[in-house]
Design a protein with these regions (language model features):
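Glycine-rich, acidic/polar active-site loops that bind/position phosphate-bearing ligands
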Residues: 1-470
């Protein structure tokens, strides 16, 4: 759908009584408000509606608060999680005075990135395919205050419940630590919930390729087909929305938090990327791994800027509890053919059209409307400056002796380190005005003040075990 008349007709055909207007905030959370379908006029669909931008995190001040949401008519769908038939549309944010797209609207950053790619002449399309893992729990509790803090997670799949008394009796079949990859029923207890998620995605026009249990107990993955950067980012938001709501409908709770469970694998968002021009794949060639020279330079840019990229691809303090040795997390900045211990993997493919690179460091805590463009900008910088990625690492990097391992560059070990890296390395993001200095500065300030310092200033329960009797 591309015209207001088509959208209004679609609403009538589906008996919609409400219109839900969704938009992404600066940190990556969907916000929304809903209007009766009678308010959905052609004028409203073309011009948008006003709202208070000062009430959204990281946006306007109260003395300059008026903002406008403008529907992107190509994103119209029926939302399956409302009792009353509700049409949903993703919106862009504009300044109502100038009519210009708002610089801190993350979706605007993605749109500018796609335009910048075309302007370089390098390619006309970038395809992105994220693989986002998540956990499903039966019970989650947490609290934090001056008097104490705790968290508690639970799933009937988890091994600590092997001795628990359960309603109707404990039937065993728990999943041990790091033994959850591809188990069949009855170990895979939430298989039907995943299937419901997939069917819901398909009903909404999302092409799903596969779904399965992941390595950790209660951990899962559903893979949808790659698409252009903006459409893939939009699908990622629907993906999270569907997973969370189907989980709630089935008495579960879903999280995309990178590391909710100590001593087991965390959740990543491995991101496949390829550039095309005039319908031809530019990453296919006769170099290492079947890649083109351009693709190798793209990898060089990713690896060079990876510490700064981490500020967007791994933007949570919790992200760095996943990026530690021993849990299949790619902390070593190297590339390789088929090798999952490297930060960049070159998957085996059947044809040149499938030739791509997979960046394995990101996690789903990322705001994909910022993370996808940041990765592309790093890769393009590699192409523009012919950055050599070095020699591939065709060994299990985790097994290298310390003297060799220490020569390989590493991902940051904390969000603070990632922010410092971004502070000193962000010029590549400013090309084409894709990221503005304001966006980078605001991101740095928010993450440091509201997250890094907030975590650093609070006692941790494990500190009591270590230090109470000091």
């Amino acid at each position: 759908m591309t015209t207001p008349k088509e959208v209004i007709e679609f609403a009538k055909e589906n008996d919609a009584v409400m219109v839900d207007m969704k938009f992404i905030d600066f940190l990556g959370t969907w916000q929304h408000f809903t209007v009766p379908v009678g308010e959905m006029t052609e004028e409203m669909l073309e011009e948008g509606r006003m709202f208070d931008g000062s009430s959204i995190r990281c946006w306007q001040t109260i003395d300059n608060s008026d903002m406008k949401v403008v529907p992107d008519l190509s994103t119209v769908k029926m939302d399956p999680f409302y009792e009353h038939p509700t049409l949903s549309v993703i919106c862009d944010i504009q300044d109502p005075v100038t009519g210009e797209d708002y610089s801190r609207d993350p979706r605007n950053v993605t749109k500018k990135a796609e335009k910048y790619l075309v302007s370089t002449g390098i390619g006309d399309t970038i395809y992105v395919g994220p693989e986002a893992e998540f956990f499903l729990f039966d019970d989650v509790r947490f609290a934090q205050g001056p008097e104490g803090g705790f968290y508690s997670i639970d799933s009937t799949e988890c091994p600590w419940n092997s001795g628990a008394e359960e309603m109707g009796g404990n039937k065993a079949y728990k999943i041990g630590h790091k033994f959850g990859y591809f188990p069949s029923a009855p170990f895979d207890q939430d298989r039907d919930i995943r299937a419901e998620m997939v069917l819901t995605m398909q009903d909404m026009g999302i092409t799903v390729e596969a779904q399965h249990h992941e390595v950790a107990p209660a951990q899962h993955e559903i893979d949808f087909r790659f698409d252009t950067m903006l459409r893939s980012a939009d699908m990622m938001q629907w993906y999270k929305y569907i997973v969370r709501n189907v989980a709630i409908d089935n008495g579960k709770t879903a999280t995309f938090m990178p590391k909710p469970m100590f001593s087991d694998n965390g959740s990543g968002m491995h991101t496949h990327q390829s550039i095309w021009k005039d319908g031809q794949p530019l990453f296919a060639g006769d170099q290492y791994g079947g890649l083109s020279e351009m693709a190798l330079y793209y990898i060089g840019g990713i690896l060079k800027h990876a510490p700064a990229l981490a500020a967007f691809t791994n933007p949570l303090t919790n992200s760095y509890k996943r990026l530690v040795p021993g849990y299949e997390a790619p902390i070593n900045l190297a590339y390789s053919n088929r090798n999952r211990s490297a930060a960049v993997r070159i998957p085996v493919v059947d044809s040149p059209k499938g030739r791509r690179i997979e960046y394995r460091c990101p996690d789903s805590g990322a705001n994909v409307y910022l993370a996808f463009p940041a990765m592309m900008m790093a890769g393009l910088d590699g192409i523009q400056n012919k950055i050599d990625p070095g020699d591939p690492m065709d060994v299990n990097i985790y097994d290298l002796p310390p003297e060799k391992l220490n020569k390989i560059a590493k991902m940051p070990s904390s969000l603070h380190e990632a922010m410092e890296a971004l502070k000193s390395d962000h010029e590549f993001l400013l090309k084409g005005d894709v990221f503005t200095k304001d966006v980078i500065d605001y991101w740095l300030n928010w993450k440091m003040e509201e997250e890094v310092k907030a975590i650093d200033s609070r006692p941790h329960p494990h500190e009591f075990e270590l230090y109470y009797h000091c």
